[in-house]
Amino acid sequence: MLTCNDKINPKTLLEEIMALRPWRKGPFEISQIKIDSEWDSSIKWDLVKNATLLKDKVVADVGCNNGYYLFKMLEHGPKSLVGFDPGVLVKKQFEFLAPFFDKEKKIIYESLGVEDLHEKYPNAFDVIFCLGVLYHRKSPLEALKALYHALKIKGELVLDTLIIDSPLDIALCPKKTYAKMKNVYFIPSVSALKGWCERVGFENFEILSVLKTTPKEQRKTDFILGQSLEDFLDETDHSKTLEGYDAPLRGYFKMLKPSKR
């Protein structure tokens, strides 16, 4: 949990926090008020925080949401940090949080998507984190290309995406929704994802972890509006989504932009 002990009027603070719902990423604690977010993002952070060194590196978080991972990255001493997310509400959440967790104003927050990277930030970053974005893209290869071109030579990409459990080079293309999400287009097998990444130009594809999403990591709280993971799964068989697909399985990966291609 990210904690700040600044003394603030608790009633006013809580009103501001609740006005910014839903809180997807967190948790945070400000002046003893805990923002109990839908996702316990510390679980994902613990899986990727040691994937590569961030000290003195130029680092990006693509799909940064309210900045939870950016604030955690600050603890590792990067040279600079840039977050990218086109969402309006999540930027407002970041602007609310930053005075507590980025007091030196080291983080740059860009209201841009992955598709804007290669034009605005070509060959710019030593490390890019892209967590939970790829399956929302209608063209995952184009998204991977954008990430590739935004990296410096020998730069590293740390990627998290939904995957399917299959040895084949295939991807699931949900008909209408996946776990009630309308904006999920391609969920690859690990083998298919590796092929996509290699076609774009990445090398040294490494599996960091593969984990099922559980209610410990994603669940309904007072700080979100609406439903969460358990509402998206089959009531009688939690190994399946409501649509009958396999329940969410996530893969965490690291790869390198080589010096020559």
Swiss-Prot record:
CDD domains noted in UniProt: AdoMet_MTases
Gene Ontology biological-process entries: tRNA wobble uridine modification
EC code(s) of this entry: 2.5.1.-
Keywords, comma-separated and alphabetical: Transferase, tRNA processing
Any Pfam family the entry gives: Methyltransf_9
Binding site for carboxy-S-adenosyl-L-methionine: K25, W39, K44, G63, V114, E115, Y135, R250
InterPro entries on file: CmoB (IPR010017), Mo5U34_MeTrfas-like (IPR027555), SAM-dependent_MTases_sf (IPR029063)
Family statement: Belongs to the class I-like SAM-binding methyltransferase superfamily. CmoB family.
Assembly: Homotetramer.
Function: Catalyzes carboxymethyl transfer from carboxy-S-adenosyl-L-methionine (Cx-SAM) to 5-hydroxyuridine (ho5U) to form 5-carboxymethoxyuridine (cmo5U) at position 34 in tRNAs.
Stated name of the protein: tRNA U34 carboxymethyltransferase
